[in-house]
């Protein structure tokens, strides 16, 4: 099994992971010690997952963290503030964190992710507003 196969077999046609798969947007899913039998694409080993996250954020131009405190803080800690593009230009890496808990977004900023833009709101509302703004709903 795989996430793309699951999406196809169960006729999934919406959601964040669906959107990433459909539009070929790379993502990293890491499990926790409590996970029981993660999906094939989920890194069960925390060190391997962190390495995959680090590799992906180094290639990113925009990172959006949604409602997972430990993953958000870890991602913020490993996200560079800029990226050198193949043509030599330097551009910023935009880091956004959305969580309903003010503690989470403050912790991200307290840990040194100074270039992060944080929003304290319900992730479902955030996604709805973004989708509406993009004319998707």
Features from the language model and the residues they span:
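C-terminal functional extensions of proteins
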Residues: 1-63, 68-137
């Amino acid at each position: 099994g795989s996430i793309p196969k699951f999406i196809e077999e169960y006729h999934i046609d919406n959601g964040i992971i669906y959107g990433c798969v459909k539009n070929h947007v790379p993502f990293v899913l890491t499990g926790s010690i409590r996970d029981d039998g993660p999906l094939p694409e989920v890194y069960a080993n925390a060190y391997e997952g962190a390495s995959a996250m680090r590799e992906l954020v180094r290639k990113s131009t925009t990172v959006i963290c949604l409602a997972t405190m430990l993953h958000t803080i870890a991602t913020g800690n490993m996200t560079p503030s800029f990226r050198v593009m193949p043509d030599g230009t330097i551009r910023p890496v935009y880091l956004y964190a959305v969580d309903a808990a003010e503690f989470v977004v403050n912790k991200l900023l307290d840990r040194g992710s100074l270039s992060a833009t944080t929003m304290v709101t319900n992730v479902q509302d955030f996604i709805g507003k973004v989708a509406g703004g993009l004319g998707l709903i």
